[in-house]
Amino acid sequence: MGMTPTQRATLEDVTQFIYREARLQDEHQYDAWESLWADDGVYWVPANGDDIDPEQKMSIVYDNRSRIALRIRQYHTGKRFGQTPQSRLRRVVSNVELIEDDGKEVRVAANAMLFESHQRGDVVWASRNEYTLRREGDDFRMVLKKVVLVNNQSALYSMAFLI
């Protein structure tokens, strides 16, 4: 099924937003990354599948906006042992799909591959990311970012950064 010109424009806008979000994370610009979040934003990395209830089952990450801010403050202390020295990161985002647009919020999904290089070794993290983005002026704010890791049913030995 084809897209309308409005849908194509929306998809281009949200794709650029997601690319910017990925770049900010890769460059460890976490204050700027934090500014992309809505006040009621939720950051969720489920464990053991992708269709669980995060209120009932364990998650790798299930953070509200204040917890996101706390993680960033902790990172800035320089005392995050897992990130000393800092990992070098690079994400590749692809297959961005417009799922729903109700005029106020846009739901999109994308595939992502993250390469992490650290003194303990290199790791590749693969995921399907789902976003709910709220329109705010000419930009968006993240209301939900759900990162479904391909291997989220396996032991994850180190994830000392915000994926």
Regions found by a protein language model. Give the residues of each.
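Short, low-complexity N-terminal intrinsically disordered segments enriched in polar/charged residues
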Residues: 1-39
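Conserved aromatic-histidine-acidic binding/catalytic patches
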Residues: 9, 56, 121
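A generic "alpha-helical surface" signal
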Residues: 12-16, 59, 66, 124
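Hydrophobic pocket/interface hotspot
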Residues: 21, 33, 68, 108, ...
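Short helix-to-loop capping/linker segments positioned immediately adjacent to catalytic or ligand/cofactor-binding
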Residues: 21-23, 79-86, 118-120
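A solvent-exposed, acidic/Ser-Thr-rich amphipathic alpha-helical stretch
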Residues: 39-109
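A beta-strand edge to alpha-helix "cap/lid" segment located at domain peripheries
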Residues: 90, 97-163
